[in-house]
């Protein structure tokens, strides 16, 4: 978007003589001429039109000589004036402007703007109107009554309209005001029973909700464009020799490079006549041309059938090139029921698979008026659409649904006239959209074998758009196809997952639910379309109507009936080696993820799947100072999460949701049931606030008091000389630079990697040391001299980076070696300190070289990539005994489906951990095989345990 921006001290009056407002349709990047700073004006921002450009401003030439620019003063940025192309804005009236300005999030504002019906209803909401209020995202709406409507602060020329609502019934006490805003009483209600909200948080309660049709969020540009002389889907005839042949128009437009010749028409013939493949001069003009039955002729050679009615563009439908209102043509034989889609040139597509039968029936068939059938299931996205009155829109009243033997015996059905854009012909039928056998080359010859009634096993997982069986779907063609998904699966011989859609309207070339001779579902003839699942999108017309289930309340034993896990009362140590491997490995193993729970799933799996170092947390009896829900939390962790995980290798998401709800009881916590969190947040709330776990780490800094904590975050500056650091190096360097020591040897050491947030990593790869020697990091512990191996008496932090003496290692020396080392001229000014030793250190220990080492073993690594946490755990002694866990590895169903956790072996990790640091540094991360790349490149926390402090040893 081309634009210019100025800073103005004061906007003079000629700008505001006429109040015309525009909303930006895309983001604009502009430069402030005074500060030279780049500012972003987001999509959804609102500006007031500048009528007089001569006052204090100079016109900025448009890029590449573009004209028709509009000058705007952005209302949210009072000193910002910019010029934008006309195509990048849409005019809105002042009343809409006031409603939208109250929504501070421009993205949400733009979303509401597209929902014209809801925006229009906002004008009707006034004092006394009953409404529902959305207080928090994802939660239920509370009933209320509007007590105030207007601006909260009338400081600007145009102010946003807010609504003061008194909450009723279950909403009482959930608000935040008694009607006072910034000391001014705008309405009166009880304390905490009122809220001030913008329109996006309100829903008008109506006795009769008949506004479904206009809830379709159409485009902002509704300008009419010239239509071609013949309408797509219209019936035509042509004379071939002595006979008249009929067909359906599938293309009508000028040819590229031959515009002067006028319109050409592509006709899908009723009989196998023609040889046009949809191309002209190598350009694909039509995706539905069949070389067996399609012909391309000049429009003068085409005989249109009688005109039955004047066609108008569908309300709020997207208009494409070649769309208009020249009139439609119909054939005298009965037409198939279907929707009047926007005609126009179809883009090339490989979405559609050939079905069976000819593209147009050879025998005329009487068609019933269209009905749509939707499974009545608890969480069907279309559930709210099933009570639409029969006279909705332009569709004819629905007939009785077909006999139940043609439908699934497992469901009950509702009849629903579905299409928002159907326009009936004079005979009551609906014009249809042909789908010819245009892609036989994709599928090969059709199988004409008898229909099989036992299709291959359906694939239950949806796609990235949350689509599943029962979802309202749209196939983005020109015009689009709309329907409901009846089947998802992978037919034999295909590598693609297909979706079987029952279209809302009949379409030439479609079936009654069969594909390649196999029946996958049952529907009316010419309504079954099979497409690639990835080519489907949620039906955009009903984006604002599809209810989003409350994922918190949905996570219960009823909804998750097929995924429930056991309760185990008996205390269970972790199973190791082969036994543990066999229990834990496979799909539907580990902890099931649900609704942003991966941070919690992976952390719990790391801590308890194959380690007992923290099992004391599960066993400590309740004390008088514990929170009231201490026992509930501990029992839940022990019997419903840890023990079942160790015995059966699986924990259901409902158990984790119980824990998440408990976490939210803590005053310092919020969002644990729904938001993305970090493992350290979870550990702090669980260990410190609820279970009051004894701090895992006791650390002292330079003789100060001991500090307690549960994990240690490594802070350090990046050393360019270090390619791939080890955890040993990082921990020692961090301790030396901060002058820290462990006051006690920890039984469990959780180390957070040096990174900032979820994205920025200090090192591209980190080597997770399998063994951590913390001897030199402990207070009151005998340590070896770095030179002779004797008992160290002094430590010198300044010698740490000295390349001449074991570079990158902590330097402690005996009395003799310390004197020798510091005789060197470059070390003369070093300040070394005495090593603190235990008072009762046996004299013979160090003299006989028996200075003990304190070592810890790596037992788990928590990793993060693109905000998703996964876990690596070690289940045995062997170097290759590694497992990889992902709580959301697979998906069963769409938005209201279920995540399938998975635990997989990853023995390749052991091979990479045997490599030298130099080899790892030179290794391209993209060439690291299997899961090992995530372990080496995405480590977030490394967890170590003392081999001598396990509870069950």
From Swiss-Prot:
Record-listed Phosphoserine modification sites: 384, 415, 419
SMART domains reported in the protein's UniProt record: CAP_GLY
The keyword Endoplasmic reticulum is annotated on this UniProt entry: no
Residue ranges, annotated region (Interaction with IKBKG/NEMO): 467-681
Gene Ontology terms describing biological process: innate immune response; necroptotic process; negative regulation of canonical NF-kappaB signal transduction; negative regulation of canonical Wnt signaling pathway; negative regulation of inflammatory response; negative regulation of interleukin-18-mediated signaling pathway; negative regulation of JNK cascade; negative regulation of NF-kappaB transcription factor activity
Region named Interaction with TRAF2: 391-466
Post-translational modification: Phosphorylated on several serine residues by IKKA and/or IKKB in response to immune stimuli. Phosphorylation requires IKBKG. Phosphorylation abolishes TRAF2 deubiquitination, interferes with the activation of Jun kinases, and strongly reduces CD40-dependent gene activation by NF-kappa-B.
Catalysed reactions, as listed in the record: Thiol-dependent hydrolysis of ester, thioester, amide, peptide and isopeptide bonds formed by the C-terminal Gly of ubiquitin (a 76-residue protein attached to proteins as an intracellular targeting signal)
Binding site for Zn(2+) 1: 785, 788, 814, 817
Gene Ontology CC annotation, any one: centrosome
Gene3D superfamilies found in the cross-reference section: CAP Gly-rich-like domain, Cysteine proteinases
Listed GO MF terms: cysteine-type deubiquitinase activity; K63-linked deubiquitinase activity; zinc ion binding
A matching Pfam family: CYLD_phos_site
Region (Disordered): 313-349, 384-410
Region (B-box), start-end ranges: 778-830
Assembly with partners or alone: Interacts (via CAP-Gly domain) with IKBKG/NEMO (via proline-rich C-terminal region). Interacts with TRAF2 and TRIP. Interacts with PLK1, DVL1, DVL3, MAVS, TBK1, IKKE and RIGI. Interacts (via CAP-Gly domain) with microtubules. Interacts with HDAC6 and BCL3. Interacts with MAP3K7. Identified in a complex with TRAF6 and SQSTM1. Interacts with OPTN and SQSTM1. Interacts with CEP350. Interacts with RNF31; the interaction is indirect and is mediated via SPATA2.
PANTHER family from the UniProt entry: 40S RIBOSOMAL PROTEIN S3A
Family designation: Belongs to the peptidase C19 family.
Protein name listed in UniProt: Ubiquitin carboxyl-terminal hydrolase CYLD
Organism of this sequence: Bos taurus
């Amino acid at each position: 978007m081309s634009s210019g921006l100025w800073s103005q001290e004061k906007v003079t009056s000629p700008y505001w003589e006429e109040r015309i407002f525009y909303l930006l349709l895309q983001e604009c990047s502009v430069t402030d001429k005074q500060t030279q700073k780049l500012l972003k004006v987001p999509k959804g921002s609102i500006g007031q039109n500048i009528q007089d450009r001569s006052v204090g401003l100079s016109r900025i030439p448009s890029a590449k000589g573009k004209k028709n620019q509009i000058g705007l003063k952005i209302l949210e940025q009072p000193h910002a004036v910019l010029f934008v192309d006309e195509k990048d804005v849409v005019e809105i009236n002042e009343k809409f402007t006031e409603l939208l300005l109250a929504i501070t999030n421009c993205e949400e504002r733009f979303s509401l703007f597209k929902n014209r019906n809801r925006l229009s209803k906002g004008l009707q909401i006034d004092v006394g109107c009953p409404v529902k209020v959305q207080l928090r995202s994802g939660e239920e709406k509370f009933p209320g009554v509007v007590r105030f409507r207007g601006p909260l602060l009338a400081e600007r020329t145009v102010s946003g309209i807010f609504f003061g609502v008194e909450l009723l019934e279950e909403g009482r006490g959930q608000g935040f005001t008694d009607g006072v805003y910034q000391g001014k009483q705008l309405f009166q209600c009880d304390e905490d029973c009122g809220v001030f909200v913008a329109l996006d948080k309100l829903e008008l309660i109506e006795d009769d909700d008949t506004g479904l049709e206009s809830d379709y969020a159409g485009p902002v540009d509704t300008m009419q464009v010239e239509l071609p002389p013949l309408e797509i889907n219209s019936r035509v005839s042509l004379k071939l020799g002595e006979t008249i042949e009929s067909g359906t128009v599938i293309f009508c437009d000028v040819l590229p490079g031959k515009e002067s010749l006028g319109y050409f028409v592509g006709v899908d013939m009723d009989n196998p006549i023609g040889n046009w493949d949809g191309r002209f001069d190598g350009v694909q003009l039509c995706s539905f041309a069949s070389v067996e039955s399609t012909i391309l002729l000049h429009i003068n050679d085409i005989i249109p059938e009688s005109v039955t009615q004047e066609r108008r563009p569908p309300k709020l439908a997207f208009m494409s090139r070649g769309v208009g209102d020249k009139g439609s043509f119909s054939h005298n034989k009965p037409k198939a029921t279907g929707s009047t889609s926007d005609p126009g040139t179809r883009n090339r597509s490989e979405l559609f698979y050939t079905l069976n039968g000819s593209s147009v029936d050879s025998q005329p068939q009487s068609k019933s008026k269209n009905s749509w059938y939707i499974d009545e299931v608890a969480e069907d996205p279309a559930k709210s659409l099933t009570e639409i009155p029969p006279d909705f829109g332009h569709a004819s009243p629905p007939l009785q649904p077909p006999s139940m033997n043609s439908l699934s015996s497992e469901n009950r059905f509702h009849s629903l006239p579905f299409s928002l854009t159907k326009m009936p012909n004079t005979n009551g039928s609906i014009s249809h959209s042909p789908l010819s056998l245009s892609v036989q080359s994709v599928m090969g010859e059709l199988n004409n074998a008898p229909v099989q009634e036992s299709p291959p096993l359906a694939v239950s997982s949806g796609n990235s758009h949350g689509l599943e069986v029962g979802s309202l779907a749209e196939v983005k063609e020109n015009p689009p196809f709309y329907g409901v998904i009846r089947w998802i699966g992978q037919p034999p011989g295909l590598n693609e997952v297909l979706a079987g859609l029952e279209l809302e309207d009949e379409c030439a070339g479609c079936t009654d639910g069969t594909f390649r001779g196999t029946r996958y579902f049952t529907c009316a003839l010419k309504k079954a379309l099979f497409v690639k699942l990835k080519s489907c999108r949620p039906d955009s017309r009903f984006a604002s109507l599809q209810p989003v289930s409350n994922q918190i309340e949905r996570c219960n034993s009823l909804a998750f009936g097929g995924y429930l896990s056991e309760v185990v009362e008996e205390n269970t140590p972790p199973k190791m080696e082969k036994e543990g491997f066999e229990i834990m490995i496979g799909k539907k193993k580990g902890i099931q993820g649900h609704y942003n729970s991966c941070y919690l799933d992976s952390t719990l799996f790391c801590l308890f799947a194959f380690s007992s170092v923290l099992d004391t947390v599960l066993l400590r009896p309740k004390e008088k100072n514990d929170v009231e829900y201490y026992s509930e939390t501990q029992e839940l962790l022990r019997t419903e999460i840890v023990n079942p995980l160790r015995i059966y290798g699986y924990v259901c998401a409902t158990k984790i949701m119980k824990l998440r709800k408990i976490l939210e009881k803590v005053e310092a916590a919020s969002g644990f049931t729904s938001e993305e969190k970090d493992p350290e947040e979870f550990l702090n709330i669980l260990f410190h606030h609820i279970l009051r776990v004894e701090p895992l780490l006791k650390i002292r800094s330079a003789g100060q008091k001991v500090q307690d904590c549960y994990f240690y975050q490594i802070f350090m500056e990046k050393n360019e000389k270090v390619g791939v650091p080890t955890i040993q190096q990082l921990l020692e360097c961090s301790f030396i630079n901060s002058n820290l020591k462990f006051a006690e040897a920890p039984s469990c050491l959780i180390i957070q990697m040096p990174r900032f947030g979820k994205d920025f990593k200090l090192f591209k790869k980190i080597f997770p040391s399998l063994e951590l020697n913390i001897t030199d990091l402990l207070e009151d512990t005998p340590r070896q001299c770095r030179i002779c191996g004797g008992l160290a008496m002094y430590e010198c932090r300044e010698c740490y980076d000295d390349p001449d003496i074991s570079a990158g290692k902590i330097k402690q020396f005996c009395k003799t070696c310390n004197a020798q080392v510091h005789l060197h001229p470059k070390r003369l000014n070093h300040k070394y300190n005495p090593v603190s030793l235990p008072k009762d250190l046996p004299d013979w220990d160090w003299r006989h070289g028996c200075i003990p080492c304190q070592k810890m073993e790596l037992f788990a690594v928590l990793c993060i990539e693109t905000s998703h946490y996964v876990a690596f755990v070690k289940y045995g002694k062997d170097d290759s005994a590694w497992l990889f866990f992902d709580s959301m590895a697979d998906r069963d169903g769409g938005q209201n489906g279920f995540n399938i956790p998975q635990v997989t072996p990853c023995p390749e990790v052991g091979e990479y951990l045997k490599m030298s640091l130099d080899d790892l540094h030179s290794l391209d991360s993209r060439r690291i095989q299997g899961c090992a790349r995530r372990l080496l490149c995405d480590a977030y926390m490394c967890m170590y345990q003392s081999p001598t402090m396990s509870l069950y040893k």
